[in-house]
From Swiss-Prot:
Taxonomy, superkingdom: Eukaryota
Annotated S-S bridges: none
Residue sites binding ATP per the record: 195-202
Pfam families from the UniProt entry: ATP-synt_ab (PF00006), ATP-synt_ab_N (PF02874), ATP-synt_VA_C (PF22919)
Protein name stated in the entry: ATP synthase subunit beta, mitochondrial
Cellular component aspect of the GO annotation: mitochondrial inner membrane; proton-transporting ATP synthase complex
Broad enzyme group: translocase
GO process terms (BP): proton motive force-driven mitochondrial ATP synthesis
Organism of provenance: Neurospora crassa (strain ATCC 24698 / 74-OR23-1A / CBS 708.71 / DSM 1257 / FGSC 987)
Summary of subunit composition and partner proteins: F-type ATPases have 2 components, CF(1) - the catalytic core - and CF(0) - the membrane proton channel. CF(1) has five subunits: alpha(3), beta(3), gamma(1), delta(1), epsilon(1). CF(0) has three main subunits: a, b and c.
GO molecular function, one term: proton-transporting ATPase activity, rotational mechanism
Length: 519
């Protein structure tokens, strides 16, 4: 859908939108905070240059004057009749600037004119973006015409000052048992979903959209960074079916996509495009915004590709030397201020399941809660495949969640840790060599492990099991019941893919009745 959308829109409405965006560049600079104005925007364009060299996504532009466009300024040129945006990355000397293209450069020729816009990449923001799909440069790709707004913002900006920031300690209830009990999310915080390939990050983030964004009164921004176009397409149509996006009414979500078929320049900047839209709702409308990013690793990966294209010497494991700075500049903008908040949920691909890889390790430092998806748990058929011992949250504090919640969570983690330490003995000697107390620990731990599974609404078409949302009070009460031995008489299968303890008991009694009938 998106590919045809891009080409169809380019034939019809793109020229008019391009003209509108150019007209709006200078007024947009007036909306910037003072530090951002001085650092990221020049007061006026420096005129036209000419394409000097094209090497893949890297384009060199030569100007006739010593006055060159600043780093991060956007240049515009025409490629096969379509607007192509270039972002200035380096000054090479002899009036040449090196740029990264935000789209394919096939067909671009030397000598073509490139105009300085006088500002960074500038995108439409505000209510007009809701229900629309835009790309990294703010052009709509949903075949529904130009975005009609007079509000524009550059994608590069400073993080809010410390005096503007606010810290709150409020739980964001997701309805997912393992998260709400063991690694609860903070409203207005940053949440990371860590996992290797195929362990369920995107399904998990879609369930969070289903559980939180639909019940959430404010606006949401979903940013697809270097992921599958099919998933973005499915998400768009699913949101239409559930009225989160209403084509002729009020929508609650803006979608921003720079998918895996896009050049590295687009993938390295599209997260900033989504963040800029979320910042507008936070700063200008005082909203509590949900920002979903899938996948933040692709942001780092694209930065690594761009760094290599620019000829920088790579750092550890081949990543860009500016890895920590690139991540920090973006993450520091995702924060809660006195005006409003941004609650960010970020999927983080973990290369080769190695959490010490520099990309996920750099991301860890910025997060309030980390949900680690484990391949070992997914191989047991337990979904969501959240590792209850690796997942952490600063919100799991008795002063925030209360004593009952804290004690239940720590007891669950303790019994799972004891089971983990006993597994080697069981593998070598068998269950019979354990003491009675250890046998009871193992039995309860296995039931808890299965009870941490949960049927998802978004996976209902695949599993055939109706999705369950579990209230936090029911989650705590259910795990307390298992720890107290109230489920000792039930088989392990009773605790698999159910909601609360009452559902597990009903399922267990049904299983026992069937077994008695067979006997």
């Amino acid at each position: 859908m998106f590919k045809s959308g891009i080409s169809a829109f380019a034939r019809t409405a793109r020229p008019s939108f391009a003209a509108a965006s150019r007209r709006a560049v200078r007024p947009a600079a007036l909306n910037l905070r003072a530090p951002a104005l001085s650092r990221f925007a020049s007061s006026a364009g420096v005129g036209d240059g000419k394409i000097y060299q094209v090497i893949g996504a890297v384009v060199d532009v030569k100007f006739d004057t010593d006055k060159l466009p600043p780093i991060l300024n956007a240049l515009e040129t025409q490629n096969n009749g379509q607007k192509l945006v270039l972002e200035v990355s380096q000054h090479l000397g002899e009036n040449v600037v090196r740029c990264i293209a935000m789209d394919g450069t096939e067909g671009l020729v030397r000598g073509a004119k490139a105009s300085d816009t006088g500002a960074p990449i500038t995108i439409p923001v505000g209510p007009a973006t809701l229900g629309r799909i835009i790309n990294v440069t703010g052009d709509p790709i949903d075949e529904r015409g130009p975005i009609k707004t007079d509000k524009f913002r550059p994608i590069h900006a400073e993080a809010p000052e410390f005096v503007e920031q606010s810290t709150t300690a409020e739980i964001l209830v997701t309805g997912i048992k393992v998260v709400d009990l063991l690694a609860p999310y903070a409203r207005g915080g940053k949440i990371g979903l860590f996992g290797g390939a195929g362990v369920g990050k995107t399904v998990f983030i879609q369930e969070l959209i289903n559980n939180i964004a639909k019940a959430h009164g404010g606006y949401s921004v979903f940013t697809g960074v270097g992921e599958r176009t099919r998933e973005g397409n499915d998400l768009y149509h699913e949101m239409q079916e559930t009225s989160v996006i209403q084509l002729d009414g009020d929508s609650k979500v803006a979608l921003v996509f720079g998918q895996m078929n896009e050049p590295p320049g687009a993938r390295a900047r599209v997260a900033l495009t989504g963040l800029t839209i979320a910042e507008y709702f936070r700063d200008e409308e005082g909203q509590d915004v949900l920002l979903f990013i899938d996948n933040i690793f692709r942001f780092t990966q694209a930065g690594s590709e761009v760094s290599a294209l620019l000829g920088r010497i790579p750092s550890a494991v081949g990543y860009q030397p500016t890895l920590a700075v690139d991540m920090g500049q973006m993450q520091e903008r995702i924060t809660t201020t006195t005006k409003g908040s941004i609650t960010s949920v970020q999927a983080v691909y973990v290369p080769a399941d190695d959490l010490t890889d520099p990309a996920p390790a750099t991301t860890f430092a910025h997060l309030d809660a980390t949900t680690v998806l484990s391949r070992g748990i997914s191989e047991l058929g337990i979904y969501p495949a959240v590792d209850p011992l690796d997942s952490k949250s600063r919100m799991l504090d008795p002063r925030i969640v209360g004593q009952e919640h804290y004690e239940t969570a720590t007891r669950v983690q303790q019994i799972l840790q004891e089971y983990k330490s006993l597994q080697d003995i069981i593998a070598i000697l068998g269950m019979d060599e354990l003491s009675e107390a250890d046998k009871l620990t193992v039995e309860r731990a296995r039931k808890i492990q299965r009870f941490l599974s949960q049927p998802f609404t978004v996976a209902q078409v695949f599993t055939g099991i109706e999705g369950k949302l579990v209230d936090l009070k029911d989650t705590i009460a259910s795990f307390k019941a298992i720890l107290a031995g109230e489920g000792d008489d039930l088989p392990e299968g009773a605790f698999y893919m159910v909601g609360d303890f009452a559902s597990a008991r009903a399922k267990g009694e049904k299983i026992l009745a069937e077994l008695e009938g067979q006997a």
